[in-house]
Amino acid sequence: MLIVGPAWPLRAGGMATFNERMAYSLQEQGHEVEIITFSMQYPGWLFPGKTQLSDEPAPEGLNIRVLLHALNPINWLITARYVQQYRADYLILRYWMPFMAPCLGMLSFWSTILGSKAIRIALADNIIPHESFPLSRVLTKFFLAQTDSAATLSDSVRADLMALGYRKPSIRLKHPLYDNFGAPVDRETACNTLGLDPGFTYFLYFGFIRAYKGLDLLLEAFADERLRSQNVKLIVAGEFYESPDRYNRIIHERNLAPHLVLLTRFIRNDEVRFLFSAAQLVTQTYHHATQSGVTQIGFHYHTPMLVTDVGGLAELVDHDRSGYVCPPNPEKIADHMIDFLMNKRYAEMSAQVAVKKQEFSWEEFVRKLLSSGSPT
């Protein structure tokens, strides 16, 4: 079995983590698995972060082949030859943006032409990109034409798939838990490890900072005067993938600096469990979204979540039980933060998260993923 997508040594955040965790799960079920990752994923002018390479050790027990060049058609043919020679039963193609459509589509096309019998499954994070551009739909259609079936991680993305006219087998799967960052630790230990005062309540923004993820909404909400009487701080943990200027302007104009913990850099895997164990509420105030792996980290650590009612985010959180679902509006977001603090909702919501998380197993995910591409 071959998985094509970001993995170590790329520093690709949640997508690399997902692919590696999926490979482990497939191995646990007796499959021989190899991940083909990129030797070059993005040209420098397109990559907004500081570096594309991880300084963390390779994940143990995984076969990862650094082979695919996103912009080199000759390399696509070489990689397709490798796929054919590997004789995989399944070729899982991770798709998240139209920029990757020529590379992944031609790899799939050539591997079949060269004689590969692998069932080609598109595992699509997005069909309509967060930042659309001319030809994006054409490119996505081209990629999808080179697949035998498709799986999505939210109803909204599957609806986009259908809207593009995809008529091959498709399935909506539940995004499994990110349970590979280590076990939860007690809150005081987590705070002490991070150098935080455990006397405060902490809310958490986690992940790359991009316009669609709505950190601006969150900062505006956190400036609500009602929150100043509460002993609460917001942790912003993630690397800027755009200019920080507008966020810094909000922080300055709203005098938010004393109420923030800014960890605006790439977050290492060994830091994740401490951040989610220290936080009592994960805040995902997106302007628009498909789904987010951050939610699945929150589930693993039994941390309640506040999400905006956009895309697939609301599909996972039961409003007023495991968290809150609200409009992408600073005042409404602040209303729910106040409710969480004033009514001491953490314990009851955390208990509901612990129950809900049972729905998101990796074993069930990979079983359904493979069956989606099998002949009926």
Across the structure, where does each feature detected by a protein language model lie?
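N-terminal strand-loop element at the rim of the active site
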Residues: 5-12, 24-86, 162, 170, ...
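Donor nucleotide-sugar binding/catalytic pocket of nucleotide-sugar-dependent glycosyltransferases
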Residues: 145-185
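A short helix/loop element that forms part of the nucleotide-sugar donor recognition site in Leloir-type
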Residues: 182-196
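Conserved donor-binding/catalytic core segment of Leloir-type glycosyltransferases
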Residues: 196-213, 219-222, 235
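Nucleotide-activated donor-binding/catalytic signature segment of Leloir-type glycosyltransferases, i.e.
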Residues: 245-270
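Acidic donor-binding loop of glycosyltransferase active sites
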Residues: 274-290, 303
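Conserved acidic donor-binding segment of nucleotide-sugar-dependent glycosyltransferases
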Residues: 319-331, 338-344
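A short, well-ordered alpha-helix in the C-terminal region of glycosyltransferases
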Residues: 345-359
